[in-house]
Amino acid sequence: MEVYIDKECWDKIINYAKAAYHTEKCEIGGMSVVTQDKDGDWLIQEPVILKQEIGGTTCDLDKEELAKYYTQMAIKYNKINFRFCWWHSHHTMSAFWSGTDLSSIDEYGEGESDLSFALVVNLKEEYKCRVSVWKPVEIHQDVELNI
């Protein structure tokens, strides 16, 4: 299984991160849809930012906006095998999984999700990409992102 993101979507996430840092000196986060192709590989696409509270080292997505987003994407992608990717920035820090990040990732395992993706980027365009399998057993693996 490979994870891909096209250059346009990658640049969009990086530009969101740069804009948040240059205007607010803050992190920013958002969501993307991840679709599976016929070979079993996954493509991160359509990165968006949602209403959120941002700070120097945190970004908290609005739960109501997140629920609306999940519903809209479920309708749009109802005939395609898809999952979600939570992405966020660490601006001038390294790309790593903080304790807060790991807690946020774990929230996906509390619901019905069997598989989820997470991506953290920084202004140097470094990243960590994690695939989390929740069922039948819990496994987390940081993987290479093919840009």
PLM feature spans:
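Conserved beta-strand-loop surface patch within small alpha/beta domains used
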Residues: 1-85, 92-147
